[in-house]
A protein has these predicted regions:
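Active-site nucleophile-adjacent alpha helix/oxyanion-hole segment immediately C-terminal to the catalytic cysteine
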Residues: 44-314, 391-394, 401, 409
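Conserved catalytic-core surface of thiol
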Residues: 373-445
Length: 445
């Protein structure tokens, strides 16, 4: 190992002081902040909110201080369909309802994983991975499908937000305390020679305590409910004693098994045209595992465009914090110019960023439009976020095509847009990725 010498540091001082530009940038950044000082005008000019395909202008939702983006994105895709089908002015499905059942199922999932790894040392990487974050707010498309198919959905007016759903930090803090404590109890039981029946009985005791905690913090979810609404033509409709499952079937009416997850992960360990799953990633025990097919970016975008041309929005996962202006709602690789202003060259490619932990999937949103050039190629994309209407253009963002190439990792599209070869690859036995793989990161944050 080589230490930093005084002579070397003196040289760095001299080189910096010899460049007058650095002094000007220093003054700008220390007074205004880094990103505001190097933001480009051109990124705003190029990324206006006009799109050749524009599917919705519905009001945006707001996940507030929670990590429920994946739920919001899925429920938003349903919401647009429901507003259109039933001629509604506006409408939201309850994100808190899905949140409750996700917490409940994730608790059981975690405890079952603890039982399954009870023969491993407490310091093993997998056990440590489980205990570091027993559960959290994040998730994946296949996980939210499992929740919808088991528990249905309800209108937001039937099961509204609570303090804990809108700001989940305290909820998670104490739920994870209960789960870590439960993990110790179960591991100690198994180490002491308890049989499977005794372990499962204890797990059920723990889950009763957890269920009570969730009901007291989020509210007890309805088993059935009444619901009434008026459409844009002032026609009155109502439902009495409908279950969440029946509401999903009647008002959403989608066969979720018709949809598949497509990823773009150009790393050496994930060849294109293959299917993948992630070990230990899930929420509902017994539900189908999370599954993706990895495809090149050109094909990835082609599928997203095809679905929007057919009139349907697209759930997608990305690394939203990368080179983005949250307030203006601009996602563009040229939004900040580090090279011209600071002589800093950020040259790492998409594969390198994934391999070296610089990027991963952090946020799910909805593609609701795209601007195509004369050749049918995408120029920029309309993005429905779930951060409320005070950012972007009333909550909608715009992503440049280059940003999509570099920082988008997943879309969900109908199976019938895939070729027979692609569908066969998706349905083949998947390669199992490590629990900490970046393609599972959306569900572990």
């Amino acid at each position: 190992m080589t230490s930093l010498s005084r002579d070397f540091t003196d040289k760095l001082f001299a080189d910096y002081e010899a460049n007058a530009k650095y002094s000007a940038i220093e003054n700008a950044v220390t007074h205004n902040g880094l990103l505001k000082s190097i933001e480009t005008r051109q990124s705003a000019v190029e990324n206006d909110h006009v799109f050749s395909i524009d599917l919705t202008k519905d009001e945006v939702s707001n996940q507030k201080a929670s990590g429920r983006c994946w739920m919001f994105a899925a429920l938003n895709t349903f919401r647009h369909k429901l507003i259109s089908d039933f001629k509604l002015e506006s409408f939201e499905l309850s994100q808190a309802h899905t949140f409750f059942w996700d917490k409940y199922e994730k608790s059981n999932w975690f405890l079952e994983q603890i039982i399954a790894t009870a023969d491993q040392e407490i310091g093993s990487r997998k056990v440590k991975f489980l205990l570091d974050t027993p559960q959290q707010d994040g998730g994946q498309w296949d996980m939210v499908v499992s929740l919808f198919e088991k528990y249905g959905v309800v209108p937001k007016s039937v099961y509204p937000e609570s303090v804990a759903s809108s700001n989940s930090r305290e909820l998670n803090q104490y739920l994870n305390k209960l789960l870590r404590q439960g993990a110790q109890i179960l591991r100690d039981l198994i180490a002491g020679g308890a049989d499977q029946a005794a372990v499962q009985a204890k797990k059920e005791e723990l889950l009763q305590e957890i269920f009570n905690y969730l009901a007291m913090t989020l509210g007890l979810p309805p088993r059935q409910f009444d619901f009434a609404f008026r459409d844009k033509d002032n026609n009155y409709q109502s439902e009495q004693n409908i279950t969440p499952q029946a509401f999903f079937e009647k008002y959403v009416g989608l066969k979720l098994s018709d949809y598949v997850s497509v990823i773009n992960a150009p790393t050496a360990d994930k060849p294109y045209g293959k299917s993948y799953t992630v070990e230990m990633l899930g929420n509902v025990v017994g539900a189908p595992s999370v599954r993706y097919i990895n495809l090149p970016m050109d094909r990835f975008k082609e599928l997203a465009i095809a679905q929007m041309k057919a009139g349907e929005t697209v759930w997608f996962g990305s690394d939203v914090g990368q080179v983005s202006d949250r307030q203006k709602g601009i996602l563009a690789t040229n939004v900040y110019d580090f090279t011209a202003s600071m002589d800093i060259n950020l040259t790492q490619d998409k594969a390198g960023r994934l391999d070296y932990s610089e990027s991963l999937m952090t946020h799910a949103m909805v593609l609701t439009g795209v601007d195509l050039d004369a050749d049918g190629k995408s120029v920029k994309w309309k993005v429905e976020n779930s951060w409320g209407d005070k950012v972007g253009q009333k909550g909608y963002f715009v992503a440049s095509d280059a940003w999509m190439d570099e920082y988008t990792y997943q879309i969900v599209v109908r199976k019938d847009f895939l070729t027979a070869e692609e569908l066969a690859a998706y349905e083949a036995e998947p390669q199992v990725l490590a629990p900490w793989d970046p393609m599972g990161a959306l569900a572990s944050k």
